[in-house]
Amino acid sequence: MDAQNVEEVGKRVDFVFCAVNMKKDEIKALEEAYAKAEIPVVSNNSANRWTPDVPMVIPEINDAHLEVIEAQRKRLGTKRGFIAVKPNCSIQSYVPMLTPLLKFGIKEVVATTYQAISGAGKTFNEWPEMIDNVIPYIGGEEEKSEQEPLKIWGEVENGQIIKAVNPIITAQCIRVPVTNGHM
């Protein structure tokens, strides 16, 4: 079944989990097409993470952000369809631990992640130069690791999520020569 055939897929499902390998603008259009077809979308992709009325949810931390779905439905003209996203995989390891510490006024966080090649969607067969190698900078990952927690810790105002301004997060994301797993 072709994931881009929204009409055909829509006949067979009640909702979709979206984890496709496409350009961001194509993913955004595809997810909106599903939502507009009244099919709820839970996305693993980053395309809609910064859409103001799309909740980026870690349920035990910010389930109140789900209330923006009503504003999103108005924008999309839907009754049932919506898009919700999960955050970057690396921040799911440290945001739950940091969240209770926010009440103590932490001002700065320094985070370092060690990410397997699977996080880049690759294997050693496809990326032999990674064998016995470490890449000390992963383009785009540091920005996600520094900014996405602020959306998760943000507040809902007028149907949009306004990101928090603190703590300031500095991240270093390193690609390591292991097949699966992030630390």
Where are each of the predicted segments found?
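N-terminal Rossmann-like NAD(P) cofactor-binding subdomain of oxidoreductases
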Residues: M1-M130, V134-Y137, I161
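Charged docking surfaces used in two-component/phosphorelay signaling
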Residues: S118-M183
